[in-house]
Amino acid sequence: MRFPAPMIKYIGSKRMLVPHISGIIRTLPDVQQVCDLFAGTTRIGQALKRCGLRVHSNDLATYSEVFGTTYIATNAESVDAERLRRLLAELMALPPVRGYFTETFCEESRYFQPFNGMKMDAIRAGIDMLATNETERAILLTSLIEAADRVDSTTGLQMAYLKGWSARSYNPLELRLPDLLPGSGAVTRMDANDLVRQLDAEIDLVYIDPPYNQHSYFSNYHIWETFVRNDAPPTYGIAKKREDCRTEKSAYNSKKQAGTVFADLLNAIRAPYLLVSFNSEGYFTRDEITAMLDGKGYVASVALDFKRYVGAQIGIFNPSGEKVGSISHLRNHEHLFLVGPDRSRVEAAIGATQERAQTKQIALCGD
């Protein structure tokens, strides 16, 4: 069995949903091409690519486009892995430089140890000098982001950092070649509601995992956005967020607008199958989402119980050691909704998912 490669800490990664989503897809033999509209780190897209599907990865975040280029669009069999290893070795050999990343994220805040920040500054500048095309650039940037994530001092969100240095933050930054996958796919950076009106008619299933409350992934992971853009933006607050985090908001993050924009998205989709995941902390209830999907075909759903992300369990602290906010609950539900033209297939797929959840079985491609 081949498990997904390790990835960055990401509150929206759906790591625990991967086996359930893979299992659902495997019960639908007529599904060959899938679009992931809100791809994030591309964890779901990677799992589906491993299933032999052609995947179209989309997200508005620039860092997601980099992950999509690396893991979804790139065919591992067409890449010169030895050249990439040489480039990574050259980047690791660069002398440290005290630049924007060190000053902003290591000295003015404490996301990373300064000795690692100086390596990041040097490597980020080196990537733009050494990469000869967008694929190489994306792979090298992915390696840098994943390396930085392994030595950070957060609970997985970049809204704050730990009151004391994490143990991993003392480890030296180490670039590794990303675990590329065979096969090609597509990647876009577009508004999801615009993209669905342009999607290839051959897309068989659209996976929808929209932002579900007021928290923006753009601001939750502002450091990765800055790593990719390399634009040294002005920042604000203890978290040193990009200034444009104040204005870069999705309609899905607004309680007043989310219902309208989500309904518009669903109405515009023409694929025969829809697979929607939604968190119980979101704006919509299970019944409300079922009603929205009802006109698209037969609908079945399952609720899966999971622990909340680690920051919600231990709390987040500011530089003075004071806890920011309070812990309200430790568990929530991820709802999976499948919509399709055949009632028996839809119900069988969701029924099998419910059984796997109850027996703690997993279904990953390659087993």
Can you describe what each PLM-predicted range is?
Residues S216-I223, Q257-F262:
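A short, conserved alpha-helix within the catalytic core of class I
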Residues M1-F38, R43-C51, E65-F67, T74, ...:
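S-adenosyl-L-methionine
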Residues K249-K296, A300:
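Conserved Class I SAM-dependent methyltransferase catalytic core
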